[in-house]
């Protein structure tokens, strides 16, 4: 059995986010001035979280956010950011570069509605979920294999970095509203994983956890939080326990969904659907 902390962060704002234009995979837009401020803010919020693995989408808005987070980090040493195409945003095909309002019109003409509508050349929700599933199962295997290797070498969990509650400070000690932050507890994990990805992708990841893995939100977290797209640099944090006997059926504890208190001093709109 192995346990790991999973922190998922959405990239900072881009000009396309601000103007409500679809980016998907074909528009590789860098962060805006506000986006860099958001990335720095989330980096400062996570500065005392110890990460053993860092993964990011290979699109520039995610890369820049991941770099800002790690530049602010004080206790994660010699961690290489791994860029993975499986963490990319949903592909919107012909709708990329167009306003979200046009996507809704396209969906209506096709007798469908967002977000289930797939524009020509775009990815279906099932395809996005398949990417999320593939990457999550990869993470579970990775942590299991590393944990097993350390145990066999008699180093134990401490050989993997000894990630304890003290290394996950903001998620253990930070006092948030009940709707945002679930009850946390003292925990020691074999690994602490940071993922930097995208809004629609993260939304489908959480739907995969809920619908495919039968993950349930704790009472103190409103289930409605599952549905909205995360604000830019919103944070979701989970504790995942995976068994070698049933590696595809991990136990998942949710600590927070779409947390964005670090943006309180930044002039950015977090209320609308940002894609």
Curated annotation (Swiss-Prot):
Q: Where is this site: Transition state stabilizer?
A: 198
Kindly give the InterPro entries that the UniProt entry links to this protein. His_Pase_superF_clade-1, His_PPase_superfam, PG/BPGM_mutase_AS, Phosphoglycerate_Mutase
Location within or outside the cell: Cytoplasm; Nucleus; Mitochondrion
Record has Hydrolase as a keyword: yes
Q: What is its EC number?
A: 3.1.3.46
Q: Which GO terms describe its biological process?
A: apoptotic process; autophagy
Q: Which GO terms describe its molecular function?
A: fructose-2,6-bisphosphate 2-phosphatase activity
Catalyses which reaction(s):
beta-D-fructose 2,6-bisphosphate + H2O = beta-D-fructose 6-phosphate + phosphate
Q: Which UniProt keywords apply?
A: Apoptosis, Autophagy, Cytoplasm, Hydrolase, Mitochondrion, Nucleus
Source taxon at top rank: Eukaryota
Recorded GO cellular component terms are: cytoplasm; mitochondrial outer membrane; mitochondrion; nucleus
**Active site, renumbered:** 11, 89
Q: Name one Pfam family in it.
A: His_Phos_1
UniProt record similarity statement: Belongs to the phosphoglycerate mutase family.
The name under which this protein is listed is: Fructose-2,6-bisphosphatase TIGAR
The organism of origin for this protein: Xenopus tropicalis (Western clawed frog)
Its lineage opens with: Eukaryota, Metazoa, Chordata, Craniata, Vertebrata
User: Gene symbol?
Assistant: tigar
């Amino acid at each position: 059995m192995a346990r790991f902390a999973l922190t998922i962060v959405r990239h900072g704002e881009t000009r396309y986010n601000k103007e409500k234009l679809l980016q998907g995979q074909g528009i590789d837009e860098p962060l805006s001035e506000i986006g860099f401020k958001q990335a720095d803010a989330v980096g400062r919020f996570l500065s005392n979280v110890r990460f053993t693995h860092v993964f990011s989408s290979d699109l520039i808005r995610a890369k820049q956010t991941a770099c800002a987070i790690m530049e602010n980090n004080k206790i994660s040493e010699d961690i290489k950011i791994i860029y993975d195409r499986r963490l990319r945003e949903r592909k919107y095909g012909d709708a990329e570069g167009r306003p979200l309002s046009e996507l809704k019109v396209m969906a209506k003409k096709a007798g469908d509605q967002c977000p289930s509508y797939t524009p020509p050349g775009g990815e279906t929700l099932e395809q996005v979920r398949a990417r999320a599933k593939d990457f999550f199962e990869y993470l579970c295997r990775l942590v299991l294999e590393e944990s097993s290797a350390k145990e066999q070498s008699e180093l134990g969990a401490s050989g993997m970095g000894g990630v304890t509650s003290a290394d996950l400070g903001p998620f253990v000690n930070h006092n948030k509203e009940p709707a945002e932050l679930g009850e946390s507890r003292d925990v020691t994990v074999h690994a602490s994983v940071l993922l930097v990805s995208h809004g629609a992708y993260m939304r489908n990841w959480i739907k995969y956890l809920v619908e495919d893995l039968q993950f349930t939100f704790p009472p103190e977290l409103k289930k409605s939080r599952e549905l909205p797209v995360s604000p830019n640099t919103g944070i979701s944090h989970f504790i995942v326990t995976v068994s070698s006997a049933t590696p595809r059926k991990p136990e998942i504890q949710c600590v927070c969904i779409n947390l964005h208190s670090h943006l309180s001093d930044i002039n950015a709109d977090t209320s609308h659907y940002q894609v």
